[in-house]
Swiss-Prot record:
A Pfam family per the record: Trypan_glycop
Naturally occurring in which organism (per UniProt): Trypanosoma brucei brucei
Residues anchoring lipid (GPI-anchor amidated aspartate): 506
Protein's name according to its UniProt entry: Variant surface glycoprotein MITAT 1.6
Stated role: VSG forms a coat on the surface of the parasite. The trypanosome evades the immune response of the host by expressing a series of antigenically distinct VSGs from an estimated 1000 VSG genes.
Length: 529
């Protein structure tokens, strides 16, 4: 019996003393399944660079397209042949301005998101790349045993990949960046799909096969720094594979399922480079939903619902200055918006977009040797030149009209004064004989039956009286009083008067108002750009 016990004890001692070829050990190669997720992640980093680049381009394209349309609409406004067209162009311009104002805060934050994602990805890309390259390079020249297992096996220490091969396989360097929004597989809004290790680099992550030759993964103090144990964990791969001296768990976050409040700050800091990318990635996806679909022109429904449209109607159709005010402005002036703004080529805003597609820009406006379409001009500086040309043309026309109207108004006032003096002169003549003897007076019966000497413009014209010539002009010229109270038919036949809305108005005043609106429009453009 004693012999059996002795043999058993001897066998146990041999089992303990002899080296074992299975199980985890220090100095073993890092298992393939431990480091492969990092290789897959660096392969996916190219998609992050491309998406960040595309977002930047999408933002610029959106803003540029919207601002170009604003300029085109301002050009149409300066060339408008009707009040409705002018109002529609002004309304569409205001709608685009409102859209850009709403996007302004997103432009800054989303450009920052794209830059942040590129910077944080580049940093971690370099950290992971260096870790994998260094571990790959740590292999022997003869049997190729080293620090990374080549395949999915606990007993595979052999390394056949060179650093160059691994760099190509894992895309450890930044590839050609081009705009693309291809979805990433290794990172989502939930986290990093395959980074499931939560203990850092532990002994269970090392392979066996008895080839414990990776000295940098030794737990023996003299083999690592020859000065005691490691003073703090080594943050391999940006902290995901943090290695403590004894290869025990370091307690990292689970990067596969991240929440902003998942861990205490002390734990979170261990893998902060990953968390920075994750936050920037979430911001990127939010921004993509805002800008990737691109700029779209305002719809009829948008224009009908906007107060800015009613302001445009007020300014250009009703011919009143200022913003639309529901409390003071007559709703009747704005009740037909649904008849102006609706789908179809015969309505706005489609008529505006069609007008942009007509080849009718003057050569002088484009400063080229060809007549162009407004839609074909995309450069904002060129559009500004065209706008300036047509704005000056309109100002010159209105300035001329204003001068002529003012001259006519002055002449009309002078004629009115002469006519009044003639009337007073006739009124002073007593008796029909004296009255009728005057070349400009007639003895007429009043409505009450009495007789009175009055000025007779027809008699004055036939007799060639000087005051008659002045009065003849005055009869056809307009003053505010002469236009006041006339109906539409009479107003249209009176020189210097024009029917506006429901009132006969002095055309000189209308020209002045039109000129003022043109100046305001030009100033508005200057403020926008």
């Amino acid at each position: 019996m004693a012999v059996h016990r002795a043999l058993a004890a001897y066998a146990i001692s041999l089992y303990v003393l002899l080296p074992r070829k299975s199980g985890a050990t220090d100095k073993g190669a890092i298992k393939f399944e431990t480091w492969e997720p990092l290789c897959l992640l660096t392969q996916d980093f190219g998609n992050l660079y491309n998406r960040a680049h595309k977002l930047n381009l999408d933002i610029d394209t959106y803003v540029t397209a919207a601002q170009a349309d604003q300029l085109r609409l301002q050009i149409l406004l300066s060339r408008a042949s009707s009040k409705i067209e002018a109002a529609a162009a002004a309304a569409a311009t205001a709608a685009i301005a409102a859209d850009l104002a709403g996007k302004a805060k997103h432009v800054a934050s989303c450009k920052l998101a794209a830059t942040t994602l590129t910077a944080t990805t580049g940093y971690l890309h370099g950290r992971i790349a260096e870790f994998l390259e260094v571990m790959t390079a740590h292999r022997g020249t003869t049997n190729k045993y080293g620090c990374l297992s080549k395949s999915r096996s606990d007993n595979s220490n052999s390394i056949t990949d060179s650093v160059a091969n691994l760099k190509d396989k894992c895309k450890l360097t930044v590839q050609q960046i081009s705009p693309d929004n291809k979805a990433t597989e290794q990172i989502t809004k939930a986290g990093f799909t395959k980074l499931t290790a939560t203990g850092g680099l532990t002994s269970s992550d090392l392979g066996g096969s008895g080839q414990a030759v990776c000295m940098i993964l030794s737990t023996t103090a003299s083999e690592v720094v020859n000065n005691g144990n490691l003073d703090e964990p080594v943050p391999y791969a940006g902290g995901y594979l943090r290695r403590k001296h004894d290869l025990t768990s370091d307690g990292n976050d689970n990067l596969a399922t991240i929440t902003d409040s998942a861990s205490a700050p002390a734990t979170r800091a261990k893998t902060d480079p990953y968390l920075q990318i994750w936050r920037a990635f979430k911001n990127l996806e939010d921004c993509e939903s805002t800008f990737t679909s691109g700029y779209s022109r305002p719809s009829p429904e948008t224009l009908k619902a906007a107060d800015e449209t009613k302001t445009a109607i007020k300014n250009y159709v009703v011919q009143k200055e200022g913003k639309y005010d529901q409390a003071t402005d007559k709703e009747d002036d704005y009740k037909n918006l649904d008849k102006i703004f609706k789908d179809g080529k015969d309505f706005y805003p489609q008529k505006l977009w069609d007008a942009m597609d007509k080849k009718d820009l003057l050569k002088d406006a484009t400063q080229t040797n060809e007549i162009k379409k407004l839609a074909d001009i995309t450069d904002r500086s060129e559009l500004n030149k065209v706008l300036l040309y047509y704005t000056r043309q309109k100002e010159q026309t209105l300035t001329k009209e204003l001068k002529e109207a003012q001259e006519k108004a002055t002449q009309a006032n002078q004629n009115d004064a002469a006519a009044k003096a003639a009337e007073d002169s006739c009124n002073k003549l007593v008796g029909g004989e004296k009255c009728n003897a005057d070349k400009k007076c007639s003895y007429e019966t009043e409505t009450d039956g009495t007789k009175k000497c009055k000025f007779n413009a027809t008699k004055a014209e036939k007799s060639g009286a000087p005051v008659t010539q002045a009065q003849t002009v005055g009869e056809t010229e307009a003053t505010p009083e002469k236009c006041k109270g006339k109906d539409a038919k009479t107003c249209g036949t009176t020189q210097g008067c024009k029917w506006e809305g429901e009132t006969c108005k002095d055309s000189s005043i209308l020209v002045t108002k039109k000129f003022a609106l043109t100046v305001v429009s030009a100033a508005f453009v200057a403020l926008l750009f």
